[in-house]
């Protein structure tokens, strides 16, 4: 019986599972949003919340504890400087899981794991009104041929 057994093994050995968690945590704190399977998101979420709690403490010991889970020093520095300061007044619930449906290849449930209250960066839309001045079709082929011939000469 499986009474009081916490966490999922995710079909991996212990070392492989912890390597997966480290990679997911590094990606999460680098990009502040990752897309992964629902099971992986649920497994990583408590670790991510714990790291934000460590970042709020901002002590040397807390940094060293964070480095055991996120081996990239630049990511830990960013975690303690920006993310920890952002959630200074929040008492928990630093991440959210948004379910996206299923993956096309194997029908695995996919989810987005993201930090709450993250600053929204607007995507730049390409200008549809501007047209390129380069010739298209046969004219482009002739122009390339002429440029190549001029370059050799």
Predicted regions and their residues:
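Structured, basic alpha/beta domains of bacterial-type, RNA-associated proteins
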Residues: 1-153
């Amino acid at each position: 019986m499986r009474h009081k057994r916490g966490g999922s093994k995710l079909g991996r050995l212990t070392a492989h599972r912890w390597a997966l968690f480290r990679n997911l945590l590094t990606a999460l704190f680098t990009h502040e949003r990752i897309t992964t399977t629902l099971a992986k998101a649920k497994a990583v979420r408590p670790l991510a919340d714990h790291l934000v709690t460590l970042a709020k403490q901002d002590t040397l010991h807390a940094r060293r504890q964070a480095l055991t889970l996120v081996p990239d020093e630049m990511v830990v520095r960013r975690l303690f400087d920006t993310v920890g300061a952002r959630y200074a007044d929040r008492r928990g619930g630093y991440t959210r899981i948004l379910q996206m449906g299923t993956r096309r290849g194997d029908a695995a449930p996919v989810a987005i794991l993201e930090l709450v209250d993250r600053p929204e960066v607007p995507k730049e839309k390409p200008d549809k009104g501007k047209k390129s001045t380069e010739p298209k079709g046969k004219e482009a082929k002739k122009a390339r041929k002429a440029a190549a011939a001029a370059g050799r000469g």
